[in-house]
């Protein structure tokens, strides 16, 4: 039995998942309808949480000259130093203790989950609900990752979805690989990002005390959890050299987590296939999913941003979904939203690339 089918049988026995079903419609019956007349909220896409993370095809860039790039030299210098330190950390790998490797792997996975299961699937898209202990864990893990606080990350990500591949998209991939990967962090935001970002409903984030607490104490939290703790633990507990602890366990580990996330914005918007919606840039990219613990099924995710698995196949190359399901098994996660097979097939028939089909 295929792994994803076995997983579905197992998970259905111990948890409740909200399935987003496809109501009867002419679209599902014959795949008809012209794409340019497709409404903003498709019949198969309707769900109750929020709609500020759903692509708005009606938004277009304003005509006229583009604003001049304004470089943020502080970010350029810090990113340059970080990656120089990470490169030096690579040369130290042969001298590191085995416990340090295990520590780095542990810190990498926890940090990644703070992004994927935390700020992305929980807070940005509200694809599932989490009880307080899980939310506390994810807010700590997110701080360990140091990729902006939950409020700012979620705001930018909702803008990225709603205004994808336009000037209002913070990391618009139409501006090139480097810009969508890291360049967007090295320059001032395009005025359209600020203008359209201000129109998004962020009341759910402002109302959550844990999110605002993290935002208030983010800088000292990052200093402790992203830099001090991962350096001191191997140095103090098992006698790793301070040099290895700093450059390998901290700088290299942090740089790898950053680039794994950035590849979702760059590579997964340029390389891969589009079985769900060929009219948008995001693609299915297995290599990205491996590094980003399940975030590489990007054509599916941009088509169905409210699916907690961010993929049609749940556990397939998707450790984040496995983690969320484990949390559901012990009662810490609930109300996981999963798009029905009928809705997926209907969307593939109508907008997907013809050379691919649902597995």
UniProtKB/Swiss-Prot annotation:
Ranges annotated as spanning the membrane: 73-93, 98-118, 218-237, 242-263
Keywords in alphabetical order: Endoplasmic reticulum, Fatty acid biosynthesis, Fatty acid metabolism, Iron, Lipid biosynthesis, Lipid metabolism, Membrane, Metal-binding, Oxidoreductase, Phosphoprotein, Transmembrane, Transmembrane helix
Binding site for Fe cation 1: 120, 125, 157, 161, 301
UniProt domain comment: The histidine box domains are involved in binding the catalytic metal ions.
GO biological process, one term: unsaturated fatty acid biosynthetic process
Coiled coil: none
Reactions mediated catalytically: octadecanoyl-CoA + 2 Fe(II)-[cytochrome b5] + O2 + 2 H(+) = (9Z)-octadecenoyl-CoA + 2 Fe(III)-[cytochrome b5] + 2 H2O
Compartment(s): Endoplasmic reticulum membrane
Sequence motif Histidine box-2, location on chain: 157-161
Protein name in the entry: Acyl-CoA desaturase
CDD domains for this protein: Delta9-FADS-like
Species of the source: Ovis aries (Sheep)
PANTHER family noted in UniProt: ACYL-COA DESATURASE, STEAROYL-COA DESATURASE
Topology relative to the membrane: Multi-pass membrane protein
InterPro entries linked: Acyl-CoA_DS, FADS-1_CS
Cofactor binding note from Swiss-Prot or TrEMBL: Expected to bind 2 Fe(2+) ions per subunit.
UniProt EC number: 1.14.19.1
Position of sequence motif Histidine box-1: 120-125
PTM-bearing positions, type Phosphoserine: 203
Histidine box-3, short sequence motif: residues: 298-302
UniProt-listed PROSITE patterns: FATTY_ACID_DESATUR_1
Family, per entry: Belongs to the fatty acid desaturase type 1 family.
GO molecular function, one term: palmitoyl-CoA 9-desaturase activity
Role description: Stearoyl-CoA desaturase that utilizes O(2) and electrons from reduced cytochrome b5 to introduce the first double bond into saturated fatty acyl-CoA substrates. Catalyzes the insertion of a cis double bond at the delta-9 position into fatty acyl-CoA substrates including palmitoyl-CoA and stearoyl-CoA. Gives rise to a mixture of 16:1 and 18:1 unsaturated fatty acids. Plays an important role in lipid biosynthesis. Plays an important role in regulating the expression of genes that are involved in lipogenesis and in regulating mitochondrial fatty acid oxidation.
Cofactor(s) recorded in Swiss-Prot or TrEMBL: Fe(2+)
